[in-house]
């Protein structure tokens, strides 16, 4: 079981991801934007973060940079509808551990997230 932070501004996406991960036995907390995510990260130790790119408060890249200042190894997964050619490579170059495109495949989503957890040091 991992403790996972989901930073996603869309309520329905947040609920879906929360339910899918909880059903797999994970402890999941959610935040709706950069400020909420920062507050959660300041008060709880997480094993991974699912981070939407287009969120209030500056965007996912802003929060990623803050996370990487103190934790270079925790999996931070870009969770976004941005699926244009080159997006995955750009996210990896920015410091994300991986990329999951929306809409998600509910059958494989949990396994995909867990793959990033297993691959982390």
Regions found by a protein language model. Give the residues of each.
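Acidic catalytic/metal-coordinating carboxylates
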Residues: 33, 59-62
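Conserved acidic carboxylate
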Residues: 8
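Acidic, metal-coordinating helix/loop segments flanking the phosphotransfer/catalytic sites
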Residues: 30-48, 69
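Short amphipathic alpha-helix used as the core "switch/output" element in two-component signaling
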Residues: 61-72
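Two-component/phosphorelay signaling modules centered on CheY-like receiver
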Residues: 11-29
């Amino acid at each position: 079981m991992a403790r996972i932070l989901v930073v996603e501004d869309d309520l329905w996406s947040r609920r879906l991801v929360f339910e899918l991960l909880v059903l797999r036995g994970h402890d999941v907390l959610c935040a709706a934007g950069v400020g909420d995510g920062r507050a959660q990260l300041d008060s709880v130790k997480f094993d991974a973060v699912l981070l939407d790119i287009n969120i209030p408060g500056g965007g996912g890249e802003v929060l990623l940079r803050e996370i990487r200042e103190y934790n270079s190894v925790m999996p931070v997964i870009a969770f976004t509808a941005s699926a244009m050619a080159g997006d995955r490579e750009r996210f990896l170059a920015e410091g994300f551990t991986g990329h999951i495109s929306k809409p998600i495949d509910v059958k494989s989503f949990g396994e995909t997230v867990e793959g990033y957890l297993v691959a982390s040091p």
